[in-house]
Amino acid sequence: MRFMFLNHSYVRHSAGLERHILELLKSYAAPDTTFELAYPEDLGGGEVLSLLEERKALSGLHHILETPALVKKTIEAERRGFDAVIQSNTFDPGVEASRLAVRIPVIGLLRASLHFAATICDHVGLIVPLETHMPHTMRLVRTYGMDRFVSGIRTVGLYDTGDLSGYHDVVVQRTLAVGKELVAQGAEAIIPLGGKIYPYVVTPQELEPELGVPVINTKAVGVSYAELMARNNIKHSIKAYPCPTGLDPEAVSQRSKHAH
């Protein structure tokens, strides 16, 4: 099986981080599964992303503006013969729109992780990097019909655009603090969001012993869902995601020929 692991942004990771990501993905996957890390073009959302990152005010606006570029890249993935696209970002940017454009599976880590968690507990707590992530995240949860399942959401108040490896200890400390609050309020499992932090800097295995509940690895869930769908030739419901055939990737970003 061959999967595209699609970054939400056109900004490339360092070579070292790319190697680390591929090693992690392969550790979650079957021996015959391969991955290609891919990046969308910047079709206009890049400047907004830079501004929101600079102000540490990631609200979801950048994900909305990234959607056309992500749809375009997903169409390219289908044309190139990939078995599925896994969106690397844990807030599912472009996933719903992309499912309307292709028939290969497009996996959103948040939605997949919520439903996976629902098979092992009755109430889950969410952890996000910044306070500004909270409204957008809960909006997504409500859209997915999972709001009654989420018992609470907390933030670690931490985000950086560069290498986060130096933040390991403070991330663990803050995650355990808010995780314990969520468990005290009734969470029976925890989903930490913000893939650049979890599991790239801190792994769920580091958190579970202290929290005493399952900590969901969103990347591992995404890989397993993609394998399940590809191996069994399962596709998104055509009733839920009506999809025209033969969409040209360039049609997503070109100006209308009828524009004046």
Predicted regions and their residues:
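C-terminal alpha-helical cap/extension of soluble enzyme domains
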Residues: L6-R12, S27-D32, E36-R55, G60, ...
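Glycine-rich, highly charged phosphate/nucleotide-binding loops
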Residues: K56-E76, V170-A177
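Periplasmic-binding protein-like
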Residues: R79-N89, G186-G195
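Short, glycine-/small-residue-rich phosphate/pyrophosphate-handling segment
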Residues: A118-T155, S165, V170, E227-H260
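Active-site rim beta-loop-alpha module in soluble metabolic enzymes
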Residues: V141-G195, V201-V202
